[in-house]
Amino acid sequence: MTMNLITGKAGAPHITSSDQGAMQAGLVGNGNYLLQGGDGKFPAVTMQSANKALVPVLNLVIEGRYARVTAAETVTIESGVTGRNRNDLICVKYTRDSNNIETIALAVLKGTATSDTAADPTVPSGSILNNSGTVWIPIARIPISGITAGTPVMLVKQLPPMSQLWDSVTLYQDSNWIIMRNGRM
């Protein structure tokens, strides 16, 4: 059957993570997004030491898949080299096996050391929405200058809650005029 009523009762298991992910991607967007925390702030990766980055509790939507770091997790960054610069990427590594079992884990893509300006390492291509078996989603860059790891730079887009977006779509009506706000006022 090529058509399914996903939110209807079918009498047999028929809802997949792909179904839910496709719906969420349609509502939120096909990209990768960081959701606001319960404290109203967007969490950020920090450095604990020269070789340890701390990924805090956070919520992500990754190509329609909802993912959570439920307890802060430490990621190891390899030491830099004196006189060389490097960028490493902290990523969410998504895998889907031959039985369609999906898993995620934090992983580091190590950059190449250079005496010039560091560039991000190449992120292997892949898409959850296109059924790739492995997908790397960069969430933060760790700039390394010599043996010193710099301040992490968050790479994933921030997605504010819907309650903060209402004013951007609210109509204003006065007499015979209807005004729709588009952009900043």
Question: At which residue positions do the language-model features occur?
Answer:
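N-terminal "first-domain core" detector
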Residues: 1-60
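Detector for methionine-enriched segments
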Residues: 1-3, 23, 47, 154, ...
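Beta-strand-rich solenoidal segments
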Residues: 5-8, 53-174
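Intrinsically disordered, low-complexity, compositionally biased regions/tails
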Residues: 12-15, 25, 30, 41-44, ...
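Surface-exposed ligand/attachment interfaces on beta-rich extracellular proteins
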Residues: 13-17, 35-46, 74-86, 117, ...
